[in-house]
């Protein structure tokens, strides 16, 4: 199941150590401060999802994994592969930092926000998810939270899997990890996924001409990694992956003109690293390169026709991070450099552009008696907007054994994307969007229930909005977000329960109107149990009311979208010690709902899959 953060500190063993759902030692996370540390020493709310969780849920997309997590609200323009957005604690989709193995997702650099509908679920071995500001560690984008997708496998062997389902869904996957001698490990993976999909547009809502077709999705993925331990403290790795996706979608149709309704995405990433893992000092140097080519075109004319568009971006990064144990805690420091380059025509920008950013940061964690203190500061020097600084601090007080109060404050920012700076309506004088956040939380273990309740406020200024009168982007928006988050997990006999509740009041601070596409309330519940070797799982999610715009006519009207309750049922059975079969019914009661106005969801879906390991 999802493993919620316990309160075990790195330097003392208290009653909190009983909170960890997995076995001791406490689960290690790397995302909070770039180095492995017990999850319980991170004062920000942190959730870890393992590959075992993903297999148990039988998720076929990254979005299906993330939608189950506290504070996450997913919207999507239809089914698999269709454009999606991630809202964390009511912030914008562009206020979520998505990392792949600790490196910023390349695709987010063009549009300003990450669309994880395109990222292959086959690559995901682990997800570390931190809520709240983290710009003081990572720089731009980390306003609402950080999602770190980790591709490294943690178990040797070979697995072959296949799956089939509704809308002609099919998936085939082969992966292997082999040990070469005592010090070298090789991992290889290949994956193929395809669905015919369904017609995503709900006609009459969008005003577009009917396009009665199936909006399908095809993805092909390759992955390889080589890891080597030179000595007991020195190690290195080389890793690469790529995917080739095709998505069909519904677009606005103009008679006599090409209908651009197909997306073709090529993406490849390569990284290499060297690590020193001493008893007191740790250091790592990581370099990476990624290249994406994103075509949108009419398949009757091809992706090289004048009607087609191409967004092409290359990203280069270098990260040097260091950590030293001092007293009852540690101090970390590092520098990272990033260069993003676009080809001419990307994001409708006539010329190609380079943007460089160099950041230096300092982090610290220290325990003093019943108190735990955490802090970080960072300075970024950007080739476009100059220097920008952020900082954050948190304190935890174990006022009674097994119970803790946490208070935190942090600043964060979001840099303008390349389209906002240099596009047809761009403004090269834009400043970063800025955020100030406060949070207070209580957490504890009561009668076997591991719980946390927190309240937060986030004031965002200098939001980049489009001005209809001047036809330019300006820093003129403000947002005020207030929220309450409650999480709990507990066991009752053979049943394991995980539940969360989110209340988010996200508003335009100038007009006092709700921000679009955010559900005001969400309830999420996961029930797992084993009966006669069958592993059962029930997932419940309530999505509250939200608002969106009807873009079928101008001026655009605000529409209210009602809430919905969704149920999933999953079951798995180990036929042998090597062969496991699984089945799932998503949207069990076939509820009709939308998360983006005018775009249909799939309705009830069935999947059947099997995996063989050796």
Swiss-Prot record:
Keyword set includes Signal: yes
TBDR plug domain location: 38-152
Keyword field: Calcium, Cell outer membrane, Ion transport, Membrane, Metal-binding, Porin, Signal, TonB box, Transmembrane, Transmembrane beta strand, Transport
GO cellular component assignments: cell outer membrane; pore complex
Disulfide bonds: none
Residues reported in the UniProt entry to bind Ca(2+) 1: 199, 211, 213, 215, 250
Motif TonB C-terminal box: where in chain: 597-614
Domain of life: Bacteria
TM ranges: 158-165, 169-178, 184-195, 217-227, 232-248, 263-277, 279-296, 309-325, 328-337, 353-369, 371-381, 385-400, 403-417, 434-443, 449-458, 473-490, 494-509, 517-529, 535-550, 558-572, 585-596, 602-614
Residue span, TBDR beta-barrel domain: 155-614
Coiled coil location: none
Residues annotated to bind cyanocob(III)alamin: 83, 85, 92, 110-111, 251, 309, 517, 551
SUPFAM superfamilies: Porins
Motif TonB box: where in chain: 26-33
Protein function: Involved in the active translocation of vitamin B12 (cyanocobalamin) across the outer membrane to the periplasmic space. It derives its energy for transport by interacting with the trans-periplasmic membrane protein TonB.
PANTHER family: COLICIN I RECEPTOR-RELATED (PTHR30069:SF53), TONB-DEPENDENT OUTER MEMBRANE RECEPTOR (PTHR30069)
Family classification: Belongs to the TonB-dependent receptor family. BtuB (TC 1.B.14.3.1) subfamily.
Protein name, as recorded: Vitamin B12 transporter BtuB
Organism: Escherichia coli O1:K1 / APEC
